[in-house]
Every structure is written in structure tokens, then in C-alpha cells.
Amino acid sequence: MPPSTDSSRRNSEEGSSDGFKLDSSALNKPPEEVFDIVGKLGEGSYGSVHKAIHRESGHVLAIKKVPVDTDLQEIIKEISIMQQCKSKYVVKYYGSYFKHSDLWIVMEYCGAGSISDIMRARRKPLSEQEISAVLRDTLKGLQYLHDLKKIHRDIKAGNILLNTDGIAKLADFGVAGQLTDTMAKRNTVIGTPFWMAPEVIEEIGYDTKADIWSLGITAIEMAEGRPPYSDIHPMRAIFMIPTKPPPTFKKPEEWSSEFNDFIRSCLIKKPEERKTALRLCEHTFIKNAPGCDIMQLMIQDAQEKAILGQAPMAASSGNDATLLSEGMSTMIDGGESTLVQHKDNYVTAQSLRSQMESLRIGGEIPKSAYIPGSSKNGNSPRVQPPGHTASASDPSKNQPFAQDGTGPNFQLGTSESSYKDASYNMMNTEAEYENRFQRAVVDGDFEFLRNITLDELIRRKESLDSEMEEEIRELQRRYKTKRQPILDVIEIKKRLQ
């Protein structure tokens, strides 16, 4: 179901004023004949971001080069979502190219970089007025996405970009964000959970209100330079966020009552009690936000500081993506309700080219791209279209949102005796238990836990906290051991200069 008439009118009024467009002839050419790459803006686990010039028009663009060794179906789906977003508060997507084993994603160039870049260049957080101006634009972007029943799921300062006019735009919510997550998992890099809403961590199902929590955390990040819990181990933060009271400013008295109230409105543990982006736009703190002039002054100050410090102002590389559970795309498309299911229709691989054309993707599909259902004998796979969810024949993949339960999955209809046959009846020693548990982590088979008494399970659960604390202390000791010699040599070299 499309957005309401009021929403449609508002979206039209706030549509991107950028008239640049890649025509069909440009999409049918090799990308190096269409663009001149003039410099690298950043690099992350997903690949690299480059500043580029469109040869014919001279238009400045950003191009993300992403290695394509992931599910092509997911790429098609996410590009479809990106193409639908037409708001001046969301980074615009122009088209994509397959080039060898990479996907080149052509997007709007935001010359002032991200809010994280601004803070790094100035070496200080934002002022309260600057924060309110950033939040105003960000809320308009979120309101637009939420009207379309889409969830960003990665709101943070590094994913809010600024153009030179001082307009804040949401970024890294489409295919690049999805591929960032995929590449991070492949490289065993664990993302940071500090911006994640409690319901996302607990996997109890969530909707657009998860973005509102992340926005509240981002507001604190802009005010204090880092999000709450960032001084502790990420794995410990995962336990603390759902169980502790909502975070607040370290020194609430330093901020206005309106700003404190805005934070409280965002950081409510129960998502149903959080305000929507539309309602937050009416908050006093947002309605009193200054115009773009203050943003332009902030950008100018950051650029001057960057020149003095020889730190280039560039689009954020986005290599600190929020921890996401496996199998989750960065944005979720949907229909009428907020928690949405997708249409159950299929297309064959033969129609993939027509999909690519409609989504403005040029070039040949790389051999490294994975197409679900393909086989080594060359049989045509069945490719699911953008926004598709698995059919009833595969109920395990039929939910677009995180679902209940984070523990082991036991097959239904299996008798108690079969569990005993499949695992040890007793864990006689600590060594035996640890060995069995380590194997279970690798194999994903935790059935042996069913044969341990309830009291023993509770005891072992309680011991995990102390074990985690010890592991964190050991990690810190190893970090300091490696870091100190480097600091010592740096100090010696400084003295010799």
C-alpha cells in the first residue's frame, strides 16, 4: 500500500532537487568510459569509496566499489530499495555497474563527509544547536523512509552525511550497507552494537521504532563524541543494553531541558511507547533548530581544521557498521503494515537481465556472484525478485524481521530418547563439557544441553558472566602489552626530532 496522500505530497515536496541522471547509453558502457575516478574517499570492510566525475556533464559523484562474492539476489533486492528513495534527506542512488568481480554503486556525492568526519576534523563534539539542526534533517529522512515502511537499522553519526549546502542526509542503508555486513562476517569482524535498540539485540521482533532508539544514541554520540557504553567491550554492551535503564548524558545539567527531554523520548525501552519520527519532528528541541547556516559554518570550521591538521574531509568509509544478525538485510521493504511480509512470487534467472535494466545496473554479471539455486551443471536457477520472502515450503526464512529466541534450535517431533542417543547422557567432567560445548559452537548442534539438569544449566549460565569478565581483562592485558612498546618507540622518535 502506498503512503497516504499527505505523506505522498510531503515526499514530493521534499524530493531530491538533484536533476542528474544516468541514461541507458551510459549504463551500457564500461564505467571507466563514463566516469573519471579522481580520488579515494575511504575504505572499509566492504570495499572502497571514490570521488568521481561524470565525463559528459562534469557532475561530481561518489562511487562505491564492492566485491561481489555474495548473494546476487540480495544485491538486486537492496538496489531496488535504494532506487525507490527520492528525498533530499536521503543520499540519492543513480545506478550500478558490474565491472569484473566488483559492483560499482554510483551515488550522490556529499562533499562535507559524515558527522563523524566533522567531529574528527574539529576534534570536538557538536554544539547543541548544531545537533538540533542535524537531527531535524535526519528525522525528515527517517519520516520519509518510515512512510515507505522501510527501516534504516544503522543510524549513527558515521551514516549521516552532509552536502556543502549544509543538508544532512541518511546513507548506507541500501546495498552497500548489506554488503558491509556480509563482508564483515566473512572477515570475522564484529561490528559495534552500541546504537542497537534493545528489541533488536533480544531478537523479539522490531519495527521502525528501532531507528528512533538509534537516533537517540546518535544524539548522545554527537553531544559527547561517542555513544554510551563505548568504553566497554562490545560483547558486554550486548548484555547491558537490554537489561540496564536507558542511557542518558554523562552530565545532563550541561544540556537544555528540551534536549534532555528529546533524548528521553527516543530512549524508551518499550518500542510501542517511543514516539514516531513524525511526532519527534514536532518536539520543541527540533522545531527550534536553526537553519542550514549553522551547518555551513560547522562545515567551514571542519574544513579549515582539516587543512591545518592535514586530515582530508571525505565521506565516511562506514567500516564501523552496527552488529547485525546473520541473514538480515540493512533495510526492510514492505507493504501495508509496519511489520511486513513480502509478496510470494518468483522469477527465473533468465529474467535477471531485465531486472538489472529496470534497476539501472549495467555490465555483465560476475562469475563470482552467487545466485541461489544455481548448480554446477549449469541448470538455470530460480532467482527471487526484490522484496521476496521465502515461500511456505521454507518457513524458516519466512520472517523479514528478527524473531523470538536466540538459543539452540531443536528439531520438532524428535523423541527424548533420540536426544540421549545423539549426545552424552552426562557431562562427567568440566573438560568433557567444555570440549562438547566447543564442538557444538562449531557444528551449531546444542542438543547435548537437553541432557544436563536444570540446576546445572542455571549454574553454568551464571558462571558465564565471570568468564566473560576474565576474558575481557585478558584481552585488555594483551592489548596493553602490544600497545606499550609502540608508544615507547613513538616517544623516543619524538625526542630525537
UniProtKB/Swiss-Prot annotation:
SUPFAM superfamilies: Protein kinase-like (PK-like)
PANTHER family: FI20177P1, STERILE20-LIKE KINASE, ISOFORM B-RELATED
Coiled coil ranges: 450-486
Residues covered by the Protein kinase domain: 35-286
Lineage per the UniProt record: Eukaryota, Metazoa, Ecdysozoa, Nematoda, Chromadorea
Protein name: Serine/threonine-protein kinase cst-1
Biased amino acid composition, Polar residues: 390-416
GO cellular component annotations of the record: cytoplasm
Gene this protein is translated from: cst-1
